Amino acid sequence: MRNFYSYNPTIGRTYVYDNKFYKNLGSVIKNAKRKQHLIEHLKEEKQLDPLDTFMVAEDPFLGPGKNQKLTLFKEVRNVKPDTMKLVVNWSGKEFLRETWTRFMEDSFPIVNDQEVMDIFLEANLKPTRPNRCYRFLAQHALRCDPDYVPHEVIRIVEPDYVGVGNEYRISLAKRGGGCPIMNLNSEYNNSFESFIERVIWENFYRNNVYIGTDSAEEEEILLELSLLFKVKEFAPDIPLYSGPAY
């Protein structure tokens, strides 16, 4: 007698396979993980929604404007352990007329309206001896009396560690910021001394900066100090040249 209920799969059965019912196992797992990550990301964003009511300050260095760098000096300084040395003395050689004149002629050759949006003091620190393992320290003060004479060396008290690239950058802009100047080059050429006092220090801080290390030995530091001007330039009201192109 023939058995109609045979469990042998080869008897009386035909299978037709359609590729649309088959998917790559890797893509299935990736899609599932992608959906899971999206759900988790949406949950995290929802937890941060209450923070939308708060405001944070962005780094002004990354804002719009053209950067013009004035290198004040580059020299080697010796720093003893547990002390910090003054690296900025605004009444000294950092303000030589030759340095400023070359900077103004190279950086602002175009005669148009400009605005000094911010000035950054930038200190680049490098060890002079190889295979030294220490970190750079820095401390600065923006506000001080005009007749204040800073100490050349101070003790280390709550300093800041210099960040990535051993660069220490400080914004010198006062509250409100900005220094609109009509034709910066002519302002400088009229009177060098009045330009520094009236334009720069009336609108920006004359700060004090101290540099040190956390080393237990005396270290030699290659210090490069520069001022970085963030300048906004305005287009002239009328074309500089008249012709078919205009």
UniProtKB/Swiss-Prot annotation:
Cellular component GO terms, alphabetical: viral occlusion body
The organism's place on the tree of life at top rank: Viruses
Keywords: Viral occlusion body
Pfam families: Polyhedrin
Keyword Hydrolase: no
Record flagged with keyword Ribonucleoprotein: no
GO molecular function, one term: structural molecule activity
Entry function: Major component of the virus occlusion bodies, which are large proteinaceous structures (polyhedra), that protect the virus from the outside environment for extended periods until they are ingested by insect larvae.
Protein family membership: Belongs to the polyhedrin family.
Protein name: Polyhedrin
Organism: Agrotis segetum nuclear polyhedrosis virus (AsNPV)
Gene, per the UniProt record: PH
